[in-house]
Design a protein with these regions (language model features):
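Multi-pass membrane proteins that catalyze or facilitate reactions on polyprenyl-/lipid-phosphate substrates
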Residues: 1-106, 113-225
Length: 225
C-alpha cells in the first residue's frame, strides 16, 4: 500500500513540470504568469479564482455524497462502511496533479481546497483525498520556497538571510495551521463551511475590484492603481 501511494504521489507531481513550459509570444514561462497576476494592481483574477475554488468544493461535496459505499471489517470484528474509494489510481493522481498545477498559476485558487475537490470528483473518500492533497503539497511547497529564495538571492537588493528565514518559517506555520483547520473541517463534516467561505470572499473580492476599477483607486491604500 505504501509503495502504491508513493508511486501515485510521484505521478501526481509530474504535471508541475508544465509550469516551466514557455508561454508563446510572451517570453515567459507558465509559472511567471502567476507572479505577474499576483503582483498587478487589480484583484479580479483572485476573486474569480476564489469563486472557482468554491464551485469545485461544492461539486466535490455533491460527488462525495453520491460516492459508492465500501464495507470493511474493523479491528473489533464489526463491519464498518466508508463512502468513496481510499486507493488512488493513475488517472486520479494525474487529475489532482493538474489541479495543483492550476492552483500554482491562478492566485486565489486554494491549492488544498481545489486538489481535495478534484479527488472527491474522482470518487475518492474525503479523508483519503485530504491526506493525498496534504502529502502532495509538501514537495511542491518546498520546491516553490527554494525557487523563491534562489530568485531573491539573485536580486540586486539585499533582502537579508534573517528576513528570508522569517518569511519561510511564517509561511510554513501558516500552511500547517491551515491544513490542521481543513482536517478539522473534514473530520467534522463541515466542508461546506469552507466552500461558502471562499464563495463569500470571492464575491467581496470581485465587488472591491469593480469599485477600484471605477474609481481608479486602491481602496486599502488610497493610492491610484
Amino acid at each position: 500500500h505504501d509503495r502504491r501511494l508513493l508511486m501515485m504521489l510521484m505521478i501526481g507531481l509530474i504535471p508541475l513540470f508544465l509550469l516551466f513550459l514557455p508561454v508563446p509570444g510572451t517570453g515567459m514561462k507558465l509559472k511567471d504568469i502567476s507572479e505577474l497576476w499576483a503582483s498587478d494592481s487589480t484583484i479580479w483574477i483572485e476573486g474569480f479564482a476564489l469563486l472557482m475554488t468554491s464551485a469545485l468544493l461544492f461539486l466535490g461535496i455533491r460527488a462525495s455524497k453520491g460516492a459508492k459505499v465500501h464495507h470493511f471489517t474493523r479491528k473489533d470484528g464489526k463491519v464498518g462502511e466508508i463512502r468513496g474509494r481510499t486507493k488512488f489510481h493513475t488517472a486520479d493522481a494525474i487529475c489532482v496533479g493538474v489541479t495543483q498545477c492550476a492552483a500554482a498559476v491562478f492566485p486565489g485558487l486554494s491549492r488544498s481546497g481545489s486538489t481535495m475537490a478534484a479527488g472527491l470528483l474522482r470518487g475518492i473518500n474525503q479523508q483519503a483525498a485530504l491526506d493525498y492533497s496534504f502529502v502532495l503539497g509538501i514537495p511542491s511547497i518546498l520546491a516553490a520556497a527554494v525557487l523563491t529564495i534562489k530568485d531573491a538571492i539573485g536580486q540586486p537588493v539585499d533582502i537579508g538571510v534573517g528576513a528570508m528565514i522569517a518569511g519561510v518559517v511564517t509561511a510554513a506555520v501558516v500552511g500547517f495551521l491551515a491544513i490542521k483547520l481543513l482536517k478539522w473541517i473534514v473530520t467534522t463534516n463541515k466542508l461546506q463551511v469552507f466552500a461558502y467561505y471562499t464563495l463569500v470572499l470571492g464575491v467581496i473580492t470581485l465587488i472591491v475590484s469593480v469599485i477600484e476599477a471605477v474609481t481608479g483607486t486602491n481602496l486599502f491604500t488610497g493610492m491610484p492603481l
